[in-house]
């Protein structure tokens, strides 16, 4: 009896479930290249993430001795989950990337002034993954331009709906 492997979604895409998003990153940075990285986590952190106690809004990534670490992301521990260890909510967590990706990111960060910003934390086939993006900070006038563009798109949609409804 050969059993065909089942696919989670159409076209072989894996099902992912978002744990946390960093919407502020889109507002404060010009996001360019995105990378998917694994996280080196402890057991209590996985339990807390399953309970939805993760926050990546204040986080950023940096390169230290050829490895990339996530700083400032908060995983609030469950009271009953960690009895034998002392949990640290905002500890540095190692990101797992291929060496070629680390080298590419390292050159862009050091030479071109980019920042590594976490944009999403999600499950991918029972593993926690972090999406990080190479980003450059926006100036205040860039933020205002983006807000004007959003308002214009919203007004345009409103006018089109009203026009289509009346016709």
Curated annotation (Swiss-Prot):
Residues 139-167 are annotated as: Disordered. Coiled coil: none annotated. GO terms for molecular function: RNA binding. GO terms for cellular component: cytosol. The keyword Cytoplasm applies. Residues 139-158 have a biased composition (Basic and acidic residues). CDD domains: SmpB (cd09294). It is found in: Cytoplasm. GO terms for biological process: trans-translation. Keywords: Cytoplasm, RNA-binding. The keyword Membrane does not apply. NCBIfam families: PRK05422.1, smpB. Belongs to the SmpB family. Required for rescue of stalled ribosomes mediated by trans-translation. Binds to transfer-messenger RNA (tmRNA), required for stable association of tmRNA with ribosomes. tmRNA and SmpB together mimic tRNA shape, replacing the anticodon stem-loop with SmpB. tmRNA is encoded by the ssrA gene; the 2 termini fold to resemble tRNA(Ala) and it encodes a 'tag peptide', a short internal open reading frame. During trans-translation Ala-aminoacylated tmRNA acts like a tRNA, entering the A-site of stalled ribosomes, displacing the stalled mRNA. HAMAP family: SmpB. This is SsrA-binding protein.
């Amino acid at each position: 009896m050969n059993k065909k492997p089942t696919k989670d979604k159409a076209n072989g895409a894996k099902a992912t479930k978002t744990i946390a998003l960093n919407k502020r990153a889109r507002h404060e940075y010009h996001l360019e290249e995105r990378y998917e990285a694994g996280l080196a986590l402890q057991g209590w952190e996985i339990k807390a993430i399953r309970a939805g106690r993760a926050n990546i809004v204040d986080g950023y990534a940096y390169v230290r001795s050829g490895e990339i670490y996530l700083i400032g992301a908060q995983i609030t521990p469950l009271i009953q989950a960690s009895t034998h260890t002392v949990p640290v909510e905002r500890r540095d967590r190692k990101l797992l990337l291929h060496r070629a990706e680390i080298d590419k990111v390292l050159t862009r960060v050091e030479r071109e002034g980019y920042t590594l910003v976490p944009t999403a934390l999600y499950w991918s086939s029972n593993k926690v993954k972090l999406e990080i993006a190479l980003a450059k900070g926006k100036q205040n006038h860039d933020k205002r331009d983006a807000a004007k563009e959003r308002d214009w798109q919203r007004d345009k949609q409103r006018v089109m709906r009203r026009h289509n409804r009346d016709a």
